[in-house]
């Protein structure tokens, strides 16, 4: 069987690439080469998952998706598996695969990815869509789990950076300036020693600005372990499921911090806490009776293992 993976250098794609063998692999650098090809199976994890950037620059976000779809239009596939997101739902607090979606009520991030789903349905007769929640696994670069592991912000906007400098002493000011590089915003220089990161964390914690400041302690997210993607995909394929929410039992942020990181997390944000609680009509295939593919207890166990083996 011939197979292709689109997006093999991305977060989801790189994890799937470790778990499965593909005849060909594509990313943004060589995606045009897929035109005119025929594969028995194509897995597409090629749409970027930077929600804040998509909502900030929606035209640019859709242009990237459109360019990818223009290449995909030129390929033949016996079966096409598309990795999407649960953010296509207008209400993250309820719903399942049967819930109607009005993309006009979604933010650009969800609206564009739902639009991509619709276009792919028109292109491929045998299309499987996987809608994923927040993720964790090798290569993690964002979300609350990443922030707990990396409390020093990777990006600080100029106004906030100058505000922080006004609150610290000369030595701390010098360290901050040496560790962040100015572009459109201040970006943390990669490859800093653990000692420098630890000192930065103490400085920023004292002025009340770490990566953890962006999450309300009562926000509850659904986290999916990418280590399970191959086995869960096999369940979907074996049961000929066309649309699958790979959603897990919601995990409150304060509980995650306490149970996995031994941290008492009490942060309050200006915005109300987010509540993700989407379900799947296929949950019994995972021997779960609550509407999820995995329970909170299972996720906590996998998160503890992920933290123990995490490397910056």
Predicted segments, located by residue:
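A short, well-structured beta->alpha microelement
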Residues: 21-38, 266-270
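A short, Lys/Arg-enriched amphipathic alpha-helix followed by its capping loop at the start of a domain
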Residues: 15-23, 35, 256-259
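NAD(P)H-binding glycine-rich loop region in Rossmannoid oxidoreductase-like domains
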Residues: 32-78, 82-97
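NAD(P)-dependent short-chain dehydrogenase/reductase
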Residues: 126-129, 133-221, 228
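Glycine-/Pro-rich loop/turn segments that contact NAD(P) or position catalytic residues
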Residues: 86-145
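N-terminal Rossmann NAD(P)H-binding glycine-rich loop of SDR-like oxidoreductase domains
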Residues: 1-22
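Short glycine-/acidic-enriched loop or helix-start segments at secondary-structure transitions
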Residues: 15-16, 52-54, 90-94, 139-141, ...
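Mid/C-terminal beta-alpha module of Rossmann-like enzyme folds, strongest
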Residues: 209-211, 216, 223-274, 280-284, ...
